[in-house]
Amino acid sequence: EVHPNGIAIDKLGNIFFSDSGGSKLYKIGRDRVITAIAGTGDFNDSGDGGLALNAGLRSPGGLAIGPDEALYVAEQTTHRIRKIDSNGIITSYVGNGIFGYAGDGGPAVKANIKNPFRMKFDKVGNLYFSDRDNNRIRKVDVNGVITTIAGHSNIGWLQDGLEVRITVHNFP
């Protein structure tokens, strides 16, 4: 049973989607043929530095195509965002796998995040993502440094007129 979650389309028109229940990523080519591109189907966190097809994925969700044409996947239950390059190699890009909030001003790959959900790159190459269970929007700049853009730990609702770092978010 397939549970489609995230979706992304590259500049060639290939469609990528995550199967959160099956712990895999798929590509639908322009010829409409579906091919698995990442994940063994096992619900585990493994394979960094190796082929994405041999890697374990846990709850893959949001997807984004980076300016480098790599595919980025938010793994909600491993608290990471991983990158799959054009050679099919998977590496951690954001998050150290520790459930929590820490790391602003330092390397994104060493930061604690909680349940990354959706993400988007800007024109310059900065990555913005919802750090959902931390109630924050965070940014990874082109140098790999993570910062918080909006939100804080208290659960609440958006409030018009407040500076974004003060405004409370409830699972962005």
Question: What would you call each of these model-derived segments?
Answer:
Residues 20-21, 76, 132:
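Short loop/turn segments immediately following the C-termini of beta-strands
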Residues 9-12, 65-68, 121-124:
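Residue-level detector of Asp-centered blade-edge/turn motifs that repeat once per structural unit
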Residues 1-5, 33-59, 89-115, 145-172:
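Gly/Pro-rich loop segments of beta-rich domains
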Residues 1-11, 17-19:
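Beta-strand-rich domains and repeat architectures in extracellular enzymes and scaffolds
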